[in-house]
Every structure is written in C-alpha cells, then in structure tokens.
From Swiss-Prot:
It is an enzyme of class 5 (isomerase). One of its GO terms (molecular function) is 1-(5-phosphoribosyl)-5-[(5-phosphoribosylamino)methylideneamino]imidazole-4-carboxamide isomerase activity. It comes from Pelagibacter ubique (strain HTCC1062). InterPro entries: Aldolase_TIM (IPR013785), His_biosynth (IPR006062), HisA_bact_arch (IPR006063), Isoase_HisA-like (IPR044524), Isoase_HisA-like_bact (IPR023016), RibuloseP-bd_barrel (IPR011060). This is 1-(5-phosphoribosyl)-5-[(5-phosphoribosylamino)methylideneamino] imidazole-4-carboxamide isomerase. It comes from the Bacteria.
Length: 239
C-alpha cells in the first residue's frame, strides 16, 4: 500500500486545518520544500500536496513551490486545490506532477472531469470530500447536495485513474478515518481509492491495508504533531 505524507500550503507555509476550516489552522515552522525533503530522506516515494491558496482563488498560487519540490526530489506527487481549468492541469503536468486532483470543479461540472480524463490519460485523480454522505465543494465551504455514491456512479466510467476520498468530519481531527464509508466508496469505484482524513496511528495504516480496492492512505496532522514517527510509518510501505 502507498503512503502519502501530506503538505498543505497556505501563504507559502505548511499548515493543517481542522475539518477544512480556514479559521482553525495550525502553522508549522518548516517550509514546504524542507518538509518534502524530510519525507524523501526517510524513504517515502509519494507525496500529497494541497494548495490551499488555490482552493480559495482557483489559481495555481503555489506553483513555484511545487515546481521546486518536483525538481529537488524524486517523488511521485499528486496535487490538488482549486484546479478548475485545463490550463491549470497543464501547468502542473508540465511541472512534473504525477497526478492532478480535481475536486469541486469536477463535482460542479462533470463534463470538465470527462474532458480532463480524456486529454490527460492516467494523470487525473478525482477528489471527493464528503460530510455526512454529501459532497462538499469550494474549499469545503459549500454542500453540493449530491450524495457521494450517487455522484461516483455517474462519473465512474470517465477515466479517472485514482480516487481520493476525504471524510471532512475526520480531517485534521486524528480520530481515525471513516473506514466504513471509505469501504462503501471503494466497493463502487472503478479506480483505486486513497483514504484521507483523521489518520491518528500506525494501527490506522494497518487497518487500511486489509481493505479491498484501497491503493493508499494520506497522513498529515499526525506526522506534524509527532503522533506518528516517520521512522515507524516508513516501515508500513510496501516492499
């Protein structure tokens, strides 16, 4: 199973939000580039980056930082946060990003998702962020009134190569992921699923390994707060 240490960027800093609330954030001293280097030095191969400025503006605000990370470290990087145009996808792919995550824009406009998947085969990940079974959009500030599983069934054949499922009620809480709902999503999804939101311990990683159609798991706040040591986490990587 793949493990994706997370870097969320806001105002050029590493931050973590609680339940997606921009008013409830923790800033960390280490820079995004140095944090990526730390992950690389510990032996991680994958990295999950969210441009929180981009999530608010719809622009590739932190593209230069992401480019620097790509060029300095040999990591497979997935990037999300406010990607709302083919132009933005191209910028990230040209920068060397492995997969671009489409969230709100895909939920609001299914044709955009379909076009992106056709234009960039194997490069598009679908990011579904849900609260109480319903998808949220626009930096988690709006409820889309769309049931997660209903939406997934509609777009399942569009060609996304990865699905990142986040339970907003768990994100940043370290209360463990919503394994039950993630399992429901994985059972419906045509593509492999990444678990996100609430990882608190190595036990969560071990539990995720036993689930069907789960490709990997994203770990964020538990690393920054020292609840999970990178030395322990890297042992859970597939050989």
């Amino acid at each position: 199973m793949k493990i994706f240490p997370a870097i969320d960027i806001k105002d050029k800093k590493c931050v973590r939000l609680i339940k997606g609330d921009f008013n409830n954030k923790t800033e960390y001293e280490i820079s995004p580039v140095d944090q990526a280097g730390k992950y690389k030095d510990h032996g991680f191969k994958n990295l999950h980056i969210v441009d929180l400025d981009g999530a608010l503006t719809g622009e590739t605000v932190n593209l230069d930082i992401i480019k620097e990370i790509v060029h300095k470290f040999d990591l497979k990087i997935e990037v999300g946060g406010g990607v709302r145009s083919i132009d933005s996808i191209e910028k990230y792919i040209n920068a060397g990003v492995e997969k671009v995550i489409l969230g709100s824009a895909a939920i609001k406009n299914k044709n955009f998702l379909k076009e992106a998947c056709q234009k960039f085969p194997n490069k598009i990940a679908l990011g579904l962020d849900a609260k109480d079974g319903y998808l949220s959009v626009s930096g988690w500030k709006e409820n889309s009134n769309q049931l997660t599983l209903d939406f997934l069934k509609e777009v399942n054949d569009y060609g996304a190569s990865r699905l990142i499922y986040t339970d907003i009620n768990r994100d940043g809480t370290k209360e463990s992921p919503n394994f039950e709902e993630t399992t429901n999503v994985a059972n419906v999804s045509n593509c492999p699923v990444i678990i996100s939101g609430g990882v608190s311990s190595i036990d969560d990683i071990k539990k995720a390994k036993g689930l069907k159609n789960i490709e990997g798991i994203i770990v964020g706040k538990a690393i920054y707060d020292g609840d999970i040591k990178l030395e322990e986490l890297v042992k859970e990587l597939d050989a």
